[in-house]
Amino acid sequence: SSDDVSYYEEISELLHATGKQDMTVSNAVQSYSQKIAEQRKADMLFGVEGMSERLRWIVNKPISRDLLREKIDLCMSTSGKLRVIYQFNLPGETERDIDEFESDVEYFRAKYTTGALATTFIPNQPSAHTPFQWIVPRYSLATQARLMDLRKRFIGSGKTGLGVYLPTPLGPKNWFSQVVAEWLPVTPTLDAAIQKLPQRAEVPEMIDALAARGVRLPAAFLARDRDAVFPWSNIVTTGDDADKWKRFEGMNRKLSSERFARGTSLPSAPEI
């Protein structure tokens, strides 16, 4: 899929050479260059994951705030259009991370009087066969409410300058149904229980709502230790991390580090 692959410069060169510059592609932010920008004929998409520099560091996409602004500047000044994909409900996320995103948007709003910037937010879903499969699923209603407030504020922004669009994020009920479908067989009983879930609730309340209708999730859904057995544990994969748990522990060390607490740019700091 060209929508969820981060192409580097070599692939962009191939697209240019074969006349495929009109494909909608996602470009690795770090490799986006003036040459690539000039070759593009379709919208560019950046998948940056975290809405702040420190969250991007946590999920192993260490894109500094300065670099992100530089690459978005390059795209906006060349084509005037860009889609940026973020995740929310990431580990360690607080109001300060949304503040940083909002500040970045205001930076571009102050700089550009025309153009379109789409900022899509996807609720984090623990990824199978990655170090992040041990992240306990959560959905912050406070974060969702803040994003919806920003969405309302951005409506009509194109009439006075740079148009910023923030699509409605997937809500907790629909998100939770996707997560549960990875853990339980989809049966009429499960479907009926899912349909009765509250529209806006956090994970513990939704788990209780399922249990009240006779649907119980395995203990490993919330208790994800090193020996947890996942629904996908019997599937053998190749070419990925040899020790995923070690990488997950590294993420936890990052979360408790001074660097994460400060949230400052330290591009030369070694990875944990």
Positions of PLM-derived features:
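Conserved SAM/AdoMet-binding glycine-rich loop
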Residues: 1-118, 122-127
